[in-house]
Amino acid sequence: MNGLVIDTSAWVSYLAGGGKPELVEPALEDDRALLPPVVAAELLSGKMSPRQRRALMALLDDVILLQADQEHWYRVGDLRAALAAHGLVVSTPDAHVAQCALDLGADLLTEDAIFSRMASEVPLRLVR
């Protein structure tokens, strides 16, 4: 099975008791859940109690943290430029998440509509 890059929006829904547990939990159990570094930072930026923070960090510690080398960041810039040429302005964090999925040929779990718009221009495989 393919890896599953999980975007911040999908994590937030899942952690709140919603989202797609039928996709997230098997990916966690099978070591297919993939965590872009920016998603970890975004999740840890949220307001939470010290206990919630420890629980979140314990969960994230069990997820594969993706590495982003210099070439990856060049591809992120190229992706943003290509999308902008089609009139689609994408933030660097969202382009990074998309590029992580593209680099690995992984599926992307998200609830953010920007990724659907991106998928109309690049071969991004979204699961919902």
What does each model-identified segment do?
Residues 50-54, 83-84, 125-128:
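Short, hinge-like loop/turn segments at secondary-structure boundaries
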